[in-house]
Every structure is written in structure tokens, then in C-alpha cells.
Regions:
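Mg2+/Mn2+-dependent nuclease catalytic core
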Residues: 172, 176-178, 485-502
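Phosphate-binding site recognition
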Residues: 1-431
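Conserved catalytic cores of phosphodiester-cleaving nucleases, focusing on short active-site segments
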Residues: 439, 464-468, 477-487, 499
Length: 535
């Protein structure tokens, strides 16, 4: 049974036979258009457990001439494509799982390259005994020898190509050796019909150049027309929820949040499948991601990083410049590098429709995408001294919301007084925006299941700072929160009334709590007034 050359189709068959299978075969049509062209090199990066390996197995089964796989694809969407039959089972496919090879070589890159090369050449010799191999220790020459005789081009599928880049990130010699080996296989080789690599990180840069600059890259910051294949689309998730009798709104709350210009809703596929199979919603992230990695990155001493993390946990968006990220896990010069890495790892998601003015090319508005990832952030800050004030405030979230519902304005003010007096001050108060972040943070946990939050909502003659609208079937009052800095809580309440902020609620029937909060810079205390309004 071959390990590399024209592997058997049984791995993809296992996916097809699973109790949940989502048809992502239209991806093949995109690749077919580029076979044997200058655009034949693809590198797609996305987080762990986002379906990279399943896609690789699908491509192997489709392109490989080792077996007739028409029975697997005739009922899939790709079968309707004009290119379907033209490329089905027409190529010699080389499949390499770099993660497995790296482990097998005990993390020795030189040994890994030697082992993979000799193993593939051995399989080539068995498949083509008539071929004379001039330099069997050089993989690219062996491939060319086979192609010159068979005239059958190769499709390369490389899964987890960046494992070496991540594990050997401080071993420059090993990285150079690995990249040069890949470059030799791919660059300007006529035997390549298609090359498809998957990983978590985009291709490593050296200065302004990359050893693999022939590849077209598609990542979590720029997936282009591959966006629907990063995870499950909204339509796919709705269909699964209908089939398996799962609550779609909860599925959306827990696993949605990855957004792109033409595909506004992408869900974490592994977590969707796990939630359906276990019939419950929760975080399945720690089962697949390195928990310590998030701890390490948010703990870094980068100017402004801590404040941005606090804002993100509070449900706000921050701006990230991804242009100078070096596509590794060690080169961190600014907070932008750390936050960009968190995008590629799936901890943060870009928001192309944000109200924040960015170009969505090198600068993006990002946020924590869903409840699953919010839970991971909350778990991380719980035991982190740098964020102890943050966790203390989050832990009081339910009591705070109950105090607001009970019109207990003194208790509400006291919560924020204590938070501000904490020696690990959550944020430096310098304006109403800072105060807004702390309020959002304090209510983030308790309002997840009960409210939809809107920030700086246009209402009447101005903008309300924070509006919390009850979710469907939640019998609780709406909250309209106005914030002041060095003024008074009464001024905040007066502004709500004078500028007719309640006009926003004209289609809402029920009670609204008007919450005015002021922070006095001189006394370092908060004042709060809560009033009822009936719509």
C-alpha cells in the first residue's frame, strides 16, 4: 500500500461515511481552472481543526490515478462542473503530511527530508520500473525522470506544511534547508500540474522575499474566493441544525463570527460537529488548540497590547495592522504582530463591515468571534496577574446585572469604584471611551444569553453609548446606558431625555432602564442613577 504516491481513497471515504459530512467539493472547480498554468500553486492557511486534512484527502482521492474514485464524487456538487471528468483520476498524486513526517524524524529536519525523499523515490521506482533514475537522492530530479517517460504530471498535496516553521522557528539553518528543499521540488518544474499546501501560518518571509514566492496565498486575513471553504457557511449550519434538531441561534452564538467580505458568516466546523454529536453547546476549542499559547501571547510586554486585549474581552473591536507580520511565532516587534498571529490561530476574527475606518487590506478591525473563544479568553485571564482586575470584574457580572435590574444604583457605583481602585487597573481612565470599555467588560458575561449589545447607537439627536436589547423570548428590561467623565450621572440621564434617545425604542414594547454613570477624576469615584421608562 503506497504511503505517498497515489494513496488509496479510503481516508476520504471515511469522511463521506461519517454521520456528518458537508460537501466542500466546489473547491475542486477553483483548482481545476489553474491546473498546468502559472497560477497552479496554492497555499491555504487556517486554524487547527478547520478541515484542512479532510480537504487534502478529498483532493488526493479526486486527482489520483491510482483508483477510480468516481463513485465518491458523482453525487457531490463538483460532478456538475464542466471540468469534473476532465481532471478526475488523471494525475500522479504525491501526498505528504509534514506533521507526521516531522514527528517520525524526531524533529530532525535533515533526517525528515532524507527519509521522505528516499521513500517517495522508492515508490516511484516500484510504479515505474522502466525509468532510469539519474539522481535518486534528489526528489525533484526523480520526479522529472518519471514525468519525462510517463508524461503524466504530478499533483502535490502537502498537509501541515508549516509544522516545521512553527516548531523550528529559532533554528534558521533547519528552516533554510526545508524551504530550499520545497523550492527545489516546486519552482519552475514542468512536472507539476498543481501544488496545494495547507497550514496555519502563511509562508515565512525573509526580508521582503519568500523562497516559495511562486505560491498564491490565501489566509484568515485574505481568503479571497476560498472563504466559503475555511469552515461551515451559514446555510450549511442551518441545514445541519434542521437535520439534527439543534438550536440555530445558539449555534450561531457559540461558533459563528469569522467574517469575510463576500461570506459574512463562517463557523468553526470541528465545534459544530462536536456540538451536534454531543447534543450540547460548549467550548471544544481547548481539545484542539494549545491552551498555553494564548496565555503566552497575551502576556507579552508590548505597548498597548494589554489595553487591546481588555477591549476585546469587553466585546469591542480593535484595529490591527497585519502588513509587517513575519509569518512566524517568534518575531514580535509590536502588538500588531501578536494580534495578527491570533487572527491566524483563530482566536480573533476580522470584521469587514465594521464602523471603524480601515482599508481591509493591511489594516483590519478585529474582534473575538464567538462565545467559544470568549470562554477561552476568560479562562486565560482568570489566573493571570496582569489581568486580575479584568477577571474580578467579570466574576461580578451577574451580581452587577441584578443590581441594575433592581435599580440599586449605589451597588452599581461601588462595583466600578472597586474595579478602579484595584492595583492592576483595568484601563487608564482618560475619557468616556475608557469608561465604556469597563462597563462593557463588566456586563459581558452576564448579558451573553440575555441581551444583544449595540455601541454608539444613533438615537434621536445623538448617539447612545450602550444599548442592551433583550434577546427574543427574554423577559427583561432593555438597558440604555449613558456615560459621563467628570460631569454627573444626572447630566447623563438628562442627555438621554433631552436628545430623545428613547426614539430608538419606538418599535420596542416593554420597560427600558435608563442608566447614567459618571466618573469623577478628582474623587476617583463613580456615581450612578437608574430610572425606569415604559415604551
Amino acid at each position: 500500500m503506497p504511503k505517498y504516491l497515489n494513496k488509496e481513497k479510503n481516508l476520504f471515504q471515511e469522511s463521506l461515511d461519517s454521520f456528518i459530512y458537508v460537501d466542500k467539493s466546489p473547491l475542486i472547480e477553483i483548482l481545476n481552472k489553474c491546473i498546468k498554468t502559472k497560477q497552479k500553486y496554492f497555499c491555504l492557511s487556517r486554524p487547527r481543526r478547520f478541515g484542512k486534512s479532510v480537504t487534502a484527502q478529498m483532493l488526493c482521492s479526486y486527482y489520483s490515478r491510482g483508483e477510480d474514485s468516481s463513485s465518491q464524487f458523482d453525487s457531490l456538487k463538483i460532478a456538475k462542473s464542466p471540468s469534473y471528468k476532465k481532471h478526475l483520476n488523471q494525475y500522479n498524486v504525491i501526498f505528504i503530511n509534514m506533521s507526521l513526517e516531522f514527528n517520525s524524524a524526531r524533529h530532525d529536519v535533515n533526517q525528515m527530508i532524507s527519509s521522505v525523499t528516499s521513500s517517495i523515490v522508492k515508490e516511484l521506482k516500484e510504479a515505474y520500473p522502466q525509468v532510469v533514475f539519474n539522481s535518486p537522492d534528489k526528489l525533484y530530479e526523480a520526479l522529472d525522470d518519471v514525468f519525462s517517460v510517463s508524461k503524466v504530471p504530478f499533483v502535490f498535496i502537502v498537509d501541515e506544511w508549516d509544522r516545521i516553521m512553527r516548531e523550528k522557528n529559532e533554528d534558521a539553518q533547519s528552516l533554510k534547508l526545508y524551504l530550499e528543499w520545497l523550492e527545489g521540488i516546486f519552482k519552475d518544474q514542468s512536472y507539476i500540474a498543481l501544488a496545494y499546501m495547507t497550514g496555519i501560518l502563511p509562508i515565512k518571509k525573509y526580508g521582503n522575499q519568500s523562497a516559495l514566492n511562486m505560491f498564491n496565498e490565501f489566509s484568515m486575513t485574505d481568503p479571497d474566493n476560498f472563504a466559503p471553504f475555511i469552515g461551515f457557511t451559514e446555510r450549511e449550519v442551518q441545514s445541519l441544525c434542521n437535520e439534527f434538531k439543534m438550536n440555530f441561534n445558539q449555534m450561531q452564538q457559540w461558533y459563528d463570527g469569522y467574517s469575510f467580505t463576500d461570506v459574512p458568516h463562517i463557523y468553526n466546523p470541528n465545534s459544530v460537529v462536536k456540538s451536534i454529536s454531543r447534543k450540547r453547546f460548549g467550548s471544544y476549542w481547548t481539545k484542539t488548540e494549545t491552551f498555553e499559547s494564548l496565555q503566552e501571547y497575551i502576556d507579552m510586554n508590548m505597548e498597548g497590547l494589554r489595553d487591546d486585549i481588555v477591549k476585546l474581552i469587553a466585546g469591542e473591536e480593535v484595529v490591527v495592522n497585519v502588513a509587517k507580520f513575519q509569518n512566524d511565532m517568534v518575531t514580535f516587534k509590536t502588538k500588531n504582530d501578536v494580534l495578527t498571529l491570533l487572527i491566524h490561530l483563530g482566536y480573533l476574527a476580522i470584521k469587514p463591515d465594521s464602523d471603524i475606518r480601515v482599508d481591509n487590506i493591511s489594516k483590519f478591525a478585529v474582534h473575538i468571534p464567538n462565545e467559544e473563544i470568549k470562554m477561552e479568553f476568560r479562562n486565560i485571564v482568570e489566573d493571570n496577574e496582569k489581568y486580575s482586575g479584568v477577571y474580578n470584574l467579570i466574576s461580578k457580572s451577574y451580581d452587577l446585572l441584578n443590581d441594575i435590574w433592581s435599580l440599586n444604583s449605589d451597588a452599581v457605583a461601588k462595583v466600578f469604584d472597586e474595579a478602579h481602585q484595584d492595583h492592576t487597573s483595568i484601563l487608564t481612565y482618560n475619557d468616556e471611551n475608557s469608561l465604556s470599555c469597563v462597563i462593557s467588560l463588566s456586563l459581558e458575561l452576564s448579558t451573553t444569553d440575555t441581551y444583544n449589545v449595540v455601541r454608539e447607537l444613533p438615537t434621536g439627536k445623538g448617539y447612545a453609548d450602550l444599548v442592551y436589547l433583550p434577546k427574543p423570548d427574554v423577559n427583561k428590561p432593555a438597558l440604555l446606558i449613558e456615560l459621563k467623565f467628570d460631569k454627573s450621572a444626572q447630566t447623563a440621564i438628562n442627555q438621554i431625555k433631552e436628545k430623545n434617545y428613547l426614539q430608538f425604542f419606538k418599535d420596542y414594547k416593554g420597560e427600558v432602564l435608563l442608566v447614567g454613570i459618571n466618573y469623577s477624576k478628582d474623587t476617583k469615584t463613580h456615581q450612578c442613577i437608574i430610572e425606569k421608562a415604559q415604551i
